[in-house]
């Protein structure tokens, strides 16, 4: 697979960076949840971290590994807080991807005829909707001090 259009390639690199960072952030938040007595929330963070790794890998494959000489940043929440607040950070990140990032990336790829990019953006968008819902439910549990 490869991408012919610079804009779609840039969007894939951006998504790759964001998903990679989310993967690592969620693993850290999983450990924090475990330490706070929320092992189920910890498992949720780990499951979503794995999904984010899959998204990053899919974006990377579509790029055909073309990320050399590219600085990747993501404007996502950074840091470690209490589990309920970490879940807010997760919700915000997932909602950004659902409401802004992936719809724009998908439409650009569609306009440019980049079918492989369309596919990876579509699948990520659908998964991110579920992640946001799961994080919302988990936050309610954390606020109620239930796991």
What are these regions (language model features)?
Residues 1-147:
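Non-heme di-metal
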């Amino acid at each position: 697979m490869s991408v012919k259009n610079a804009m779609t390639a840039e969007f894939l690199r951006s998504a790759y960076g964001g998903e990679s960072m989310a993967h690592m952030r969620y693993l850290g938040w999983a450990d924090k949840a475990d330490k706070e007595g929320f092992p189920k929330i910890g498992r949720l963070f780990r499951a979503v971290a794995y999904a984010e790794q899959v998204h990053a890998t899919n974006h990377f494959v579509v790029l055909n590994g073309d990320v050399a000489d590219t600085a990747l940043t993501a404007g996502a929440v950074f840091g470690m807080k209490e589990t309920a607040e970490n879940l807010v950070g997760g919700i915000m990140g997932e909602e950004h991807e659902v409401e802004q990032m992936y719809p724009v990336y998908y439409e650009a790829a569609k306009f440019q005829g980049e079918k492989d990019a369309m596919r990876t953006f579509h699948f990520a968008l659908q998964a991110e909707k579920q992640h946001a819902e799961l994080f919302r439910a988990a936050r309610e549990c954390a606020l109620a001090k239930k796991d």
